Amino acid sequence: MPEPETLPTTVLTGFLGSGKTTLLRRALTAPALADTAVIINEIGEIAIDHHLVDFVEGSVVELPGGCLCCAVREDLARTLRSLIDRRAAGDIRAFRRIVVETTGLADPAPILYTLGADPMLDHCLHLAGVVTLVDAVAGAAAIDRFPEAARQAAVADTLVISKTDLAPFGPELASRLDGLNDRARRLLACTADDPGVVLFDGTTR
């Protein structure tokens, strides 16, 4: 019997102020995410195209573009297991991939560990990639000052440089990123009009 296909899972991270929430808000109603379950890190209301989606315990909201969205309750592993169980039972519409948003201060390492260490998640999911937003204005200073910002950049498969409309992607930030992670592809957020390109293209590990 062939092995069941696992769900590709993308981790979206970025330090405070990097524009991660802005990207996520655009992505949530994009056609590219119509078959995607997105796990956000904040419980409560999020404004999406003038709609307020109110997340309550256990809720999974289908957004206008067809994306399924829920908020982390208690811990990520439990949230992921619940989504997978409800998908298998037909309680929610089937999805083909998952995006996990981290908090701005999160070290991604424990999240990546969770995906591989939990037996059920390891059986049902695979890590497609890590996408990290880096602020062109304050990114170099954040990397120097905050270990979490450096770790977010270091584990990325894709580095998305944001706020290049306010400051160029200059040699200082480029040097920091080269020292931390010279293998990741780099995108400028202002030229990445399709959130699906940012989140999915080229991130398969």
Region roles according to the model:
Residues A140-A153:
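Flexible active-site lid/hinge loop adjacent to a nucleotide/diphosphate
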Residues P2-T13, S18, T22-A142:
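Nucleotide-state-sensitive switch-loop elements of NTP-binding domains
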Residues R151, V155-R205:
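C-terminal accessory "lid"/substrate-recognition subdomains
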